[in-house]
Amino acid sequence: MKSLCYLNQEDCFPAAHKALTDPNGLIAIGGDLQPERLLSAYQQGIFPWFNQGEPILWWTPDPRAVFQLSDYRPSRSLMKTLKRQTWRFTINKAFDAVIHQCAALRQEGTWITPAIKAAYGQLHAQGDAHSIEVWQGEQLVGGLYGIAVGKIFCGESMFHLETDASKAAFHLLVTHLRRFEFTLIDAQVMNPHLARLGAKPLPREAFLTQLAQLKHQHSPATAWQPQEVKLGY
């Protein structure tokens, strides 16, 4: 029988095969959200996910929800929306506002707690966490954020205040990642919304194999400089 690992401040994460099957992928509890631990977790295919008032819970589910960038195809309806809309798009221009909106739209029971906001804000400040923003004039109407681990982007959350704005942010993300030769987006846990966007389940072992190959392949600094971008069709 597998037992749950309780982390102290300096403990390392256990191997992925020691994760529980019920609940799927729970591998450890406790520890902290310091940047060093978070980056170590993502480099091992582990991420934090817990509600306000709970201890820190760490997960590595099997299977993993992923987007293979070579397989991504935007829907016709999204492309029509993009040609019709007057949105503008930026990268890393409003990280704090994006994560705030991602938390606000979930209201009660959000897992984007003040501790998560602070931790990922630190990762952003040191160049590891990134945001995509969609604007209508000067109003932020959609976006997403996540962590770059080598040539894998680990998506965390997205939001929209206008129809399809989060899908537009995702489309921009894919376009940008392809430009810099990323091959995979980690979406963590399958759900119907991700499936509609094109996510597929990937066995954990296969995901970890890809992660091991891609996590040391770094992008140029220009990839994540704050910038306004044009969305090609």
Curated annotation (Swiss-Prot):
Origin species: Shewanella denitrificans (strain OS217 / ATCC BAA-1090 / DSM 15013)
Gene: aat
UniProt similarity note: Belongs to the L/F-transferase family.
Disulphide bonds in the chain: none
Catalytic activity: N-terminal L-lysyl-[protein] + L-leucyl-tRNA(Leu) = N-terminal L-leucyl-L-lysyl-[protein] + tRNA(Leu) + H(+); N-terminal L-arginyl-[protein] + L-leucyl-tRNA(Leu) = N-terminal L-leucyl-L-arginyl-[protein] + tRNA(Leu) + H(+); L-phenylalanyl-tRNA(Phe) + an N-terminal L-alpha-aminoacyl-[protein] = an N-terminal L-phenylalanyl-L-alpha-aminoacyl-[protein] + tRNA(Phe)
Enzyme Commission (EC) number: 2.3.2.6
GO cellular component term of the entry, any: cytoplasm
Cross-referenced NCBIfam families: aat (TIGR00667)
Lineage: superkingdom: Bacteria
Annotated function: Functions in the N-end rule pathway of protein degradation where it conjugates Leu, Phe and, less efficiently, Met from aminoacyl-tRNAs to the N-termini of proteins containing an N-terminal arginine or lysine.
Subcellular locations according to the entry: Cytoplasm
Taxonomy of the source species: Bacteria, Pseudomonadati, Pseudomonadota, Gammaproteobacteria, Alteromonadales
UniProt entry keywords in alphabetical sequence: Acyltransferase, Cytoplasm, Transferase
GO molecular-function terms, A-Z: leucyl-tRNA--protein transferase activity
Identification of the protein by name: Leucyl/phenylalanyl-tRNA--protein transferase
Keyword Acyltransferase: yes
GO BP annotations, alphabetical order: protein catabolic process
